[in-house]
């Protein structure tokens, strides 16, 4: 059964195990096997946020598999895992800016090779500073400069607000919008993750409206538990339909665990995704004039 929207299946996003989304169904952790499986399911792409941690041989194999299957690549986290909670985005010293640019150029080269649309930016605060407003101004300045760097590679930057990691400086949509607006450079936007936003902002539709033109990437998970759409309590059909109606045409990352991580649970979860997709399709069709049920 084909899917109507541009979903991605992930190759592993949660440390320390980085379990691929369909591990039980595929039976291996080999990225190319998962890319072929995602294509067979009718997915539009794959999501490999920690691709920077892979070696060149594996990245080349992933690139060839994407070309062979016609799948797209989602966003990559812009720095290696060990630097995600370091205050690199608040550092405006000459050495700090030079180090940041080196990291971003390396990530952009990898993203360009895989066809990724954007680098995900997680912004940590500097624990040795108390000037939160100035730190956010420094982040905006660095985003402005690095956005111009990634533009040379045809790639954007996308800030992902959250509190799931320690010491985050940009924790919700309001804070992310303020910094991205201050950066004021094309190609720098916001990742809207329904799991994070439901925790930090509450009202998904209000947060989506607040994100507005800054929406770069959409990640769909249900809550509680970061499970597949339809396995939780969030009004995800309305959310995705609203994003599509507003003109969003990018990939939709399914960055979730399963309600049941067994092989049968993956199959049941995939059925939930297909039902969710059908409801979204009905909600965005012009002839559909009545609200759709959520689950």
Predicted regions and their residues:
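N-terminal pre-domain/capping segments
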Residues: 1-112, 270, 274-295
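Hydrophobic faces of well-ordered beta-strands that scaffold small-molecule active sites
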Residues: 5-13, 46-48, 73-78, 119-121, ...
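Active-site beta-loop-alpha junctions enriched in small/polar residues
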Residues: 10-16, 49-51, 78-82, 124-126, ...
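Gly/Pro-rich active-site loop or hairpin
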Residues: 19-28, 86, 90-97, 170, ...
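Active-site acidic/histidine proton-transfer and metal-coordination neighborhood
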Residues: 24-30, 68, 89-189, 199, ...
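Generic structural signal for well-ordered alpha-helices
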Residues: 31-35, 59-63, 104-108, 140-147, ...
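A structural motif
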Residues: 40-43, 113-116, 215, 248-249
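Glycine-enriched alpha-helix->loop->beta-strand junction motifs that scaffold or abut catalytic
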Residues: 42, 184-189, 210-216
């Amino acid at each position: 059964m084909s899917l109507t929207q541009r979903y991605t299946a992930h190759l592993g996003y949660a440390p320390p195990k980085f379990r691929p989304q369909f591990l039980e169904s595929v039976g291996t952790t080999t990225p190319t096997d998962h890319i072929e499986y995602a294509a067979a399911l009718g997915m539009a792409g794959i999501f490999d946020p920690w691709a920077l941690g892979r070696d060149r041989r594996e990245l080349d194999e992933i690139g060839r598999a994407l070309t062979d299957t016609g799948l797209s690549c989602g966003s990559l986290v812009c720095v290696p895992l060990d630097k995600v909670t370091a205050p690199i985005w608040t550092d405006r010293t000459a050495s700090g800016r030079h180090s940041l640019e080196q990291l971003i150029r390396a990530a952009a080269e990898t993203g360009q090779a895989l066809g990724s649309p954007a680098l995900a930016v997680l912004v940590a605060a500097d624990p040795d500073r108390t000037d939160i407003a100035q730190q956010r101004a420094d982040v905006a300045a660095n985003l402005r400069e690095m956005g111009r760097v990634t533009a040379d590679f045809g790639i954007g930057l996308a800030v992902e607000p959250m509190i799931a990691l320690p010491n985050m400086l940009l924790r919700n949509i309001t804070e992310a919008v303020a910094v991205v607006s201050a950066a004021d450079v094309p190609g720098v936007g916001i990742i809207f993750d329904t799991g994070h936003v439901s925790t930090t902002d509450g009202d998904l539709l209000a947060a989506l409206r607040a994100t507005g033109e800054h929406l770069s990437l959409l990640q769909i998970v249900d809550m509680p538990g970061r499970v597949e759409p339809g396995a939780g309590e969030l009004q995800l059909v309305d959310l995705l339909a609203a994003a599509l109606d507003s003109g969003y045409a990018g990939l939709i990352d399914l960055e979730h665990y399963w309600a049941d991580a067994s092989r049968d649970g993956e199959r049941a979860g995939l059925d939930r995704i297909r039902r969710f997709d059908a409801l979204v399709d009905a909600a965005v069709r012009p002839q559909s004039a009545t609200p759709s049920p959520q689950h």
